[in-house]
Amino acid sequence: MNAQELRNKTPDQLREDLVTLKKEAFNLRFQQATGQLENNARIRTVRRDVARVMTVLNEKAAEAAN
């Protein structure tokens, strides 16, 4: 998921993506705590995807405020 793809989405779609990513991050942290996580790098990619979505949402909010 790159920033350009995210910028083409509506704010509602971005919020849905954000909820989905946060749920996935929670599940990955839970798996890590119980020792069931096999792909540790997935935590980092999900966390960065959350940051990307939040950045684009903030850009859209700032753009709408102007």
From Swiss-Prot:
Swiss-Prot/TrEMBL keywords: Ribonucleoprotein, Ribosomal protein
Gene3D superfamilies: 1.10.287.310
Highest taxon, organism lineage: Bacteria
Record keyword Hydrolase present: no
Family according to the record: Belongs to the universal ribosomal protein uL29 family.
One GO CC term, this protein: cytosolic large ribosomal subunit
Annotated organism of origin: Ruegeria pomeroyi (strain ATCC 700808 / DSM 15171 / DSS-3) (Silicibacter pomeroyi)
Designated name of the protein: Large ribosomal subunit protein uL29
GO MF, one annotated term: structural constituent of ribosome
Pfam family, one: Ribosomal_L29
CDD domains referenced in this protein's UniProt entry, alphabetically: Ribosomal_L29_HIP
Gene Ontology BP terms: translation
Keyword Ribonucleoprotein recorded: yes
Annotated gene: rpmC
NCBIfam families, per the entry: L29 (TIGR00012)
